[in-house]
């Protein structure tokens, strides 16, 4: 078996359900255990899923918890962390958030835009300037802090966040990045701008890594991997009619995911991207913080991922991970 990287993208509560369905399908149909990935990259919801995998929870148990099925001893951590109920959040209304006044950019943001225009992303900058959210995501991760006891998993887990002062992406857990408590890295990666409050770590504050990219798959370039599996719940399958801000967001996420996948392939790495089709998107809806359809999302993504993985052109790429 070659060296496999796993990228778990952003997507809120529905994104975690999508991860569970896709990963359970890979485990069931191919016999591949996502916990064995050489490196796991998690952004926002993906940082939670990645942490659970690195903590020993198998994909089948992620799905079982999501659909309220009985858990094995390996899945007991899910119940310890979250109980048996899906988390409940206020509805996420992107249009309403964008109507709130923006903050003025600080000197670090301006300096970066002037001195490094090739790496400056206007959309990312705009996300950092959104009015601060009021919900403290750290409250939702108290149990994670107690379970992980401040220690990072032994196997590589890279968690992506964005530094609010200058819009720069930070990859916690990657060699060369300052050590931080795991629960704070996850919290910062999940701090959806305008919805959750930014997370302070040391002298800096951070927001959701999805502000830079919904997947951040590009961080695995030049890592010597043979295959990268990307699970991108926020992506649209391709160009289509953009009716509203939700369609625009999916189109933007899909464009970034395709661009990152192309760059990885150009570097000699095979890439397989799982993204929701139209039927899955209909089940997921527009409020990615809603738990109303979690069970349906897991079931739909499980079936769709299995069908996609069975396509000859995809099956040939995944042959190295199947038993």
Feature roles, as predicted:
Residues 1-43, 48-323:
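Patatin-like phospholipase
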């Amino acid at each position: 078996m070659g060296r496999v990287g796993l990228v778990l993208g952003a997507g809120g509560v529905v994104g975690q359900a999508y991860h569970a369905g896709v990963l359970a399908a890979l485990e069931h149909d191919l016999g591949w255990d996502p916990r064995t990935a050489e490196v796991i990259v998690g952004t926002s919801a993906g940082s939670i899923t990645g942490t659970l995998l690195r903590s020993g929870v198998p994909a089948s148990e992620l799905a079982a918890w999501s659909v309220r099925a009985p858990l094995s001893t390996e899945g007991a951590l899910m119940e310890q962390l979250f109980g048996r109920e899906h988390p409940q959040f206020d509805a996420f209304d992107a249009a309403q958030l964008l109507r709130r006044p923006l903050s003025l950019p600080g000197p670090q943001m301006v300096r970066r835009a002037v001195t490094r225009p090739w790496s400056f992303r206007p959309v990312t900058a705009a996300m950092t300037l959104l009015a601060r959210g009021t919900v403290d995501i750290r409250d939702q991760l108290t149990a994670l802090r107690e379970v992980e006891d401040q220690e990072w998993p032994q196997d590589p887990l890279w968690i992506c966040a964005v530094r609010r002062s200058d819009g720069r992406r930070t990859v916690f857990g990657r060699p060369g990045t300052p050590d931080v408590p795991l629960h704070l890295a996850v919290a910062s990666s999940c701090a959806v701008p305008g919805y959750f409050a930014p997370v302070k770590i040391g002298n800096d504050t951070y927001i959701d890594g999805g502000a830079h990219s919904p997947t951040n798959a590009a961080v695995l370039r030049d890592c010597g991997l043979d295959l990268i599996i990307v699970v991108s719940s926020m992506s649209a399958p391709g160009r289509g009619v953009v009716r509203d801000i939700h369609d625009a967001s999916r189109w933007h996420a899909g464009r970034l995911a395709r661009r990152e996948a192309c760059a990885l392939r150009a570097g000699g790495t095979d890439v397989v991207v799982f993204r929701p089709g139209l039927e899955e998107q209909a089940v997921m809806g527009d409020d990615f913080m809603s738990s109303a359809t979690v069970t349906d999302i897991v079931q739909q993504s499980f079936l769709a991922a299995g069908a996609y993985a069975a396509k000859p052109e995809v099956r040939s790429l995944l042959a190295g991970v199947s038993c």
